[in-house]
C-alpha cells in the first residue's frame, strides 16, 4: 500500500510570566482515491502521548466537491460543510503559512 502526501503543521504559544504553554498541531494526509484526513491537537504543556481533540475527515464526493465532517464531543451539533478541492487546498495552505510565521 502506497501512502499519499503527509503535511504536519505545529505552532505553540505561551505567556512570558508562566510555564503554561498551548501547542496546536495538524496532520494532513491523502491517499489517492481514498480520503483526506486532518487531525488537530491542542495541548496545555504537551505530553509525549496525546489524543486528538478534533478530527476532520474529508471524503471525495463526485470529483467536484469534498464532504467534511467534524468529530465533536457528544451533545455538540455536528455541522456538515462542503468544500471544493480548491478551497480545501487554500485552507491547508493558509494554515501552513500561519504556522511558518510563528
Swiss-Prot record:
It comes from the Viruses. Disulfide bonds: none annotated. InterPro entries: Gemini_C4. Keywords: Host-virus interaction, Inhibition of host innate immune response by virus, Suppressor of RNA silencing, Viral immunoevasion. GO terms for biological process: symbiont-mediated suppression of host innate immune response. Pfam families: Gemini_C4. Belongs to the geminiviridae protein AC4/C4 family. Pathogenicity determinant. May act as a suppressor of RNA-mediated gene silencing, also known as post-transcriptional gene silencing (PTGS), a mechanism of plant viral defense that limits the accumulation of viral RNAs. This is Protein AC4. The lineage of its organism: Viruses, Monodnaviria, Shotokuvirae, Cressdnaviricota, Repensiviricetes.
